[in-house]
Amino acid sequence: MTSRLLPMLCTALVLVCFSTAEAKNFRWSSQGDAATMDPQSQNETFNNMINGMVYEYLVDRDKEMKLAPRLAESWTNPEPTKWVFKLRRGVKWHDGSVFTADDVVFSFNRARESAVTFKLYSTQAGVARKIDDFTVEFTTDQPNPVMLDTLANIYVMNKAWCEKNNVVKPLNYTKKEETFATRNAMGTGPYKLVTWEQGVKILHTKNPDWWGIKAGLYEGNIETVDYRPIQNAATRMAALRSGQIDFVLDPAVQDVISMRNDKSLKIWEGPEIRLIYLGFDQARNELLYSDVKGKNPFKDRRVRLAAYQAIDVEALKTTVMRGLSRPTGIALPSASGAGVPASMDVRHPYSVTKAKQLLNEAGYPNGFGFTLTCPNDRYLNDEKLCVAIAGMWAKIGLRVKVERMTKANFFPRVQGRDATAFLAGWGGGSTDAIFFLKPIIHSKDSKGAGESNYGDAKFEALDVLIDKLEGEMNPALRQKMINDAVKMIHDEVHTIPLHTQVIPWASRNNISLVHRPNNVLGLIWVKVN
């Protein structure tokens, strides 16, 4: 009897072990933490990625970055300014209630109250109107050639949940407001938020009722997702190498070469849709945090051009970025994706001599001092970039104090227009130029444009051109407008483009995933093998 029971017992043990192995825990890290669980209050890629585990868009991007149906199943564009979306039936919120058109209309109206660029996106999407429980009509002010891209920016929230918890308006992250939605979330997405201990961990668990499982969208095997913010790069990488975590979103660039030779690890890398750039306060009559009194040097194009021409981007690529950057003269996250010809990718030439001459002509022969505000946990080597640039500016007499801070403090500062000069980045899923030109280059207006134009630069001709571009449906005319805008930004030195990032990810060698140029980790495709 014992001999017969033994094989049965072994089989049972194998089955138990197999079942346990299927319930995978995925542990990952990066240098920063989430900003808020309110999905309409802070438009920052990492924060959107965390919120995207819980909340969903009407349309979203697939593995190849193509737009695909999500909460909207299909759509038509019967008139130039009308779009009709058929919503997916059978979708349930995490509390078991049914997703309907009321939630969509509510969410787009709510986003219009946002203090950041979600206001712009909801305005571009037009007015949402419920036709029936599973049909929504959007009416826009003008034709929108990138309507679907626009919708892939607004997460849909549960109307009843927001009303019950008194969060019918997005919190103002810039003012550091706290509401129930700051630390709580309830969506339709593939994961449920279990807990967020700020600065310690974010824990999610798989939503077994997610509609995407039956639809075949869930290809991973993760039951729980355990995120741990680790600001120190060496500590982060030590945790990965020792197996304490499975994945690092932002390995230190200086470690990438050695990691490529480590057989216990995998390196995933490719170009990111993101521009790293410098901006200046061009609005105030007297510059903040500067030894110049009674005027603002950065209102003078010659000063901005001097700052531009004093920067050696090739040196930054070699010494700071270790090759993980692509210097550019085009102020767009993806020039090729926006259709801008390569012939336009020309920088104002690096020349310390010319930069000094420009400062002298502008009335600053001895230069001047000011503060450069930088994040130290947001972009690849962001703090080191600022320190290196400050050193380059010192050669022409610009005396720079580098003000370093976490992104939790950086974004409220710059969004509140409390910076003299700053280093920032902009990117995302869409490569269309309007998604950079409208929030970053256009001046601020009541419809949400210019919300991320942190220096409040204003050039009337650029504003007019961008406004026309926004509704232009003729591809050839639209491309000409994009090219013209790029040239005007370059000529006026609206901002100083530095480079687009090449993003490395690092994982244990038993992890499979999809590396995408929006720098968003799709957890539904991650497998722990």
Predicted stretch roles:
Residues 29-79, 109, 186-190:
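N-terminal lobe/hinge region of extracytoplasmic solute-binding protein
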